[in-house]
Amino acid sequence: MAVGRKSLILSLLIQHFVLLHGAKILTVCFLGGSHYLWMDEISRILHNNGQEVTMFLQIADGLLPDYQMQESPYRLITWSLDKNYLKEFSEFFRDSKYNFKDCDELSSYLGLMTHFSRQCKMIFNQTSIMNLLKEEKYDLAVIDSFNPCTFLVSEKLGIPFIATHPFPVKSPWHSGIPNQLSYMPVYQSQLTDHMDFFERVKNVFMYIASAVLERKIYSLFDDVIEEHFPACSRPSFEELYKKTALWMYLTDFTIEFPHPFFPNVLYIGGVLAKPAKPVSEELEDFIAQSGEHGFIIVTFGSMVPSNPLTEFVKEMNDGFSKIPQKVIWRYRISEWPKVLQLAPNVKIMNWISQNDLLGHPKARLLVTHGGVNSIQEAIYHGVPMVAIPLFFDQFDNAVRIKAKHLGTFIPKDQLKAEKLANAIRDVIGGESYKNSAMHLSLIQRSQPFPKDQQIVRWVEHIVKVGGTDHLIPYSYQQPLYQQYLLDVFLFVCVCVIGACYLTVKLLKMFIQKLCSFRKLKQN
């Protein structure tokens, strides 16, 4: 009894020391672009609130071509891909960008996950780095779960972990989001929460297909698990999902359709959005020329800083020439097609401060690919959008933009100059779009607790209490047939059928007896 009391006191003293001096947090990021941006922001938030933060970062040319990493206030441990493989990986990204108009989304997604599995083997073979990370004895990891390898790294290091993801994962495995398929669209379904019968049928079949695809993706990592985990303790991804202390999704209900989620889920959409800073004098002079018409911002995210298809660029450039607004377009100047004359109202720039431009009082519209960070920043500043989705979740995001009356979208294979110009005119000229954007901005800005405070408080809570087992529902331990009461429905059906059968049998017996009695009476 005394030993147990001493252990409890020692545990409480350790937790008090950790909270007093800051927990040791490892953030894990193996992909650039917007993924790096939000992991960097989370790392800075935790560092600025007294945590001892280290980021385990994969650095590779081609992933962050235009983003110059600022000097990080937190510690960085980096690793890089083999030069020969890096060339192959960069070519994969380049091909995806060159062929985005006709690419097969499924094969492209599987191709990316195949590359992630190959990179995972390389990470685990970095024994000196892995040993260094293990010796640090981190209290908690925050991972970018879009790359499944981050789960395995955390498990190998023996660190409890928080998973971040760009959108809510509606999975048969446990990701904190119950699967209510009647009104919760499955990833890539391009549906809203208002589904008719055939749309619900589509949603169910896509859910089944996504479950099959998930198992296919996670099987790509079987070799890593078999090689680097003992046979007696090899984890499955289903187990790792269940072990996740907290799911943090880069969205919120300003853009997401309302739905339930478990207590171990936190929506942090808009964490990158900030009050705008003044733009450069050069940009201010250009914007001033727009007069009352204002200007629009055009950017296709950190992964597609320019567009290799001259036809696509020509349609956009021609479309912009038909509108009175000034246009600030993030596009690599060195890659502008020489055969095209830049429209007189367009200014192209290698890099733009999107958040600051969106917060400018003359900003009228954002033309976007539909990335989560761009959408959340536009909502924060109350700017409507025209989306031209290119990859993955961007198609679903574009549907949400339209459903929330934040703007409209144009399918990438239907982009024409006149169609783009008309869409811009309709959204800027339609007062209801601006009103919707301003209303959602108010919702996002007036939430009781800022996103950065929520992140900090949750991390402190998890470190203090040693996990979130108290928030995990029992459904995590139930098989699907119990979760959905299939056994109960089967039992009820058997009882009803049995009761009907017995009733019919009894009626037949009664009728036969009655008929026999009448015959006897007649005789």
Swiss-Prot record:
The Enzyme Commission number assigned here is 2.4.1.17
- Indicate how the chain sits in the lipid bilayer: Single-pass type I membrane protein
Q: Which residues lie on this side of the membrane: Extracellular?
A: 24-483
A Gene Ontology cellular-component term: UDP-N-acetylglucosamine transferase complex
PROSITE patterns in alphabetical order? UDPGT (PS00375)
Lyase in keyword set: no
Instruction: Name the Gene Ontology molecular function terms of this record.
Output: glucuronosyltransferase activity
Concerning InterPro entries, the annotation shows: UDP-glycosyltransferase, UDP_glucos_trans, UDP_glycos_trans_CS
Membrane-spanning ranges: 484-504
Tell me where the signal peptide lies.
Answer: 1-23
Enzyme category, top tier: transferase
What Gene3D superfamilies does this protein map onto? Glycogen Phosphorylase B (3.40.50.2000)
**SUPFAM superfamilies membership:** UDP-Glycosyltransferase/glycogen phosphorylase (SSF53756)
Task: Show which residues sit on the Cytoplasmic side of the membrane.
Answer: 505-523
Q: Which UniProt keywords apply?
A: Glycoprotein, Glycosyltransferase, Membrane, Signal, Transferase, Transmembrane, Transmembrane helix
The protein's recorded glycosylation sites are: 125
A Pfam family annotated for this chain is: UDPGT
Compartment(s) of residence:
Membrane
Reactions performed catalytically: glucuronate acceptor + UDP-alpha-D-glucuronate = acceptor beta-D-glucuronoside + UDP + H(+)
Record's family?
Belongs to the UDP-glycosyltransferase family.
What the protein does?
Answer: UDP-glucuronosyltransferases catalyze phase II biotransformation reactions in which lipophilic substrates are conjugated with glucuronic acid to increase water solubility and enhance excretion. They are of major importance in the conjugation and subsequent elimination of potentially toxic xenobiotics and endogenous compounds.
Q: What is this protein called?
A: UDP-glucuronosyltransferase 3A1
Taxonomic source organism: Xenopus laevis
Task: Cite the source lineage.
Answer: Eukaryota, Metazoa, Chordata, Craniata, Vertebrata
